[in-house]
């Protein structure tokens, strides 16, 4: 059994069929331990083809897990994300743990995302009926600077949070070397 699992894992992480399952984070490879959602999303890119439209319900780890960094970057840089809403499962799926996070993403499988229209940490699916009124606009520069290594998406729930984060990220990070600084 363990040999079969090892062979299967090598197929997904080392084979040519899946290219976005082993991102580099902080200088190290961070392999996807056969997370089926990540594997499925990568296959969706191929199935949808260039210019295809995709709407998916995905586990929250796709939007904030280090192993799914390359999948997020593919959606941002080689696709146009039209909307993203993440939820905390507060009674939405009664038979699933209420701490579970998931997201609904829609994107075009070509182009590039300039501004992400999203809202995070929601508890009621009714938000989907009025998303245009509640979604915040997050410029791509914020997504690039927020988490430079693993490229996780910040859990933003208001336009004010976008503005504050933009101001914070316009300054050098505490870990950056700045010439002439003390």
Predicted segment positions?
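Polynucleotide-recognition surfaces of large bacterial nucleic-acid defense/processing enzymes
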Residues: 1-15, 23-27, 49, 92-182
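Conserved beta-strand -> loop -> alpha-helix junction used to position metal-binding or nucleic-acid-contacting
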Residues: 81-82, 90-92
């Amino acid at each position: 059994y363990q040999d079969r699992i090892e062979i299967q894992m090598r197929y997904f992480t080392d084979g040519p069929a899946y290219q976005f399952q082993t991102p580099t984070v902080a200088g190290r490879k961070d392999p996807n331990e056969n997370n089926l959602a990540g594997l499925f999303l990568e296959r969706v890119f191929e199935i949808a083809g260039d210019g295809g439209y995709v709407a998916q319900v995905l586990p929250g780890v796709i939007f904030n897990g280090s192993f799914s960094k390359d999948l997020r970057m593919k959606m941002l840089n080689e696709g146009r994300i039209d909307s993203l809403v993440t939820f905390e499962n507060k009674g939405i799926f009664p038979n699933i743990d209420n701490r579970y996070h998931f997201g609904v993403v829609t994107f075009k499988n070509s182009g590039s995302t300039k501004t992400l229209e999203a809202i995070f940490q929601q508890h009621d699916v009714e938000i989907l009926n009025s998303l245009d009124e509640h979604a915040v606009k997050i410029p791509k520069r914020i997504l690039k600077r927020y988490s430079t290594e693993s490229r996780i998406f910040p859990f933003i729930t208001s336009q004010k949070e976008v503005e504050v984060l933009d101001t914070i990220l316009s300054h050098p990070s505490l870990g950056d070397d700045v010439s002439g600084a003390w």
